[in-house]
Amino acid sequence: MPSARMGQEGEMGLGYGWIRPYIHYNLRVQPFRFHEVSGAYRIFKGVPDPVLSPYGYGDYTDKGANLKLALFSPEESRYQLPGLAIGLEDFIGTSSFQAYYGVVTQILPRYGLEVSIGYGKKRIHRWFGGISWMPFWQQQNMYLQSLAFVGEYDAIPYQNSNLEKHPKGHYQKTPWNVGVKYRLCNRVDLSLSWIKGNALAFSLSSFYPFGTTKGFLPKLHDPLP
């Protein structure tokens, strides 16, 4: 589920996710501190493409674009106030996964907590929420600082075939998802989750702050004339 957190200005990220019954690829760009644009490419595992599969091109796929705008970030108040964001999902493309939402996110640095609550329309149906807890973020052990335990209330009505397009994606035992996340070398995010009460999910993503980087190679002084 979405949160109101944003990346750094000029940041770009790539991601892969195995979230049964889909495989996800995504690209994320943060052109401004308050503006995030992302694209998603989904593979419907086990669902043949009616046009291309007979020619050996694999399963059915879907592409879409997402937009998120931060109206207020928690960093602006030094985490005294929550952040607020609105978003559109899959607003370009087939719109098979289209959703609209608003979300607030409160950061509690003292406890290593991030709490989000929001309301959505279409695929994200009504109230949703999420929590992330980093119990070791203030400790000296660099290997544990970025470990986070996460949970969320998933507001997607998977039983609705108009909103969940994959024929094997309708079954859900519980809307509560739990997982663990880990940031490696401050550039790579790994996550392992138990979703819908019946399936494991895995994701891997990497990001780089092109807007603030000093470059991959050192800048040499121009030679004197």
Segments predicted by a language model, with ranges:
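A mid-sequence, solvent-exposed acidic-amphipathic segment
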Residues: 116-148, 152-154, 158
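A short, polar/proline- and glycine-enriched secondary-structure boundary/capping micro-motif
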Residues: 49-50, 126-129, 201-204
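Internal active-site segments that recognize and position negatively charged phosphoryl groups
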Residues: 88, 98-117, 127, 133-135
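Short glycine-rich, acidic/polar surface loops and turns
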Residues: 130, 177-179
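Membrane-spanning beta-strands of outer-membrane beta-barrel proteins
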Residues: 20-22, 60-64, 97, 124-126, ...
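Flexible, glycine-rich linker and terminal segments associated
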Residues: 138-141, 148-150, 158-163, 168, ...
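Short gly/pro-enriched beta-turn/loop segments at secondary-structure junctions
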Residues: 97-99, 110-114, 122-126, 142-146, ...
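Transmembrane beta-barrel domains of Gram-negative outer membranes and organellar outer membranes
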Residues: 1-93, 100, 108-111, 140-143, ...
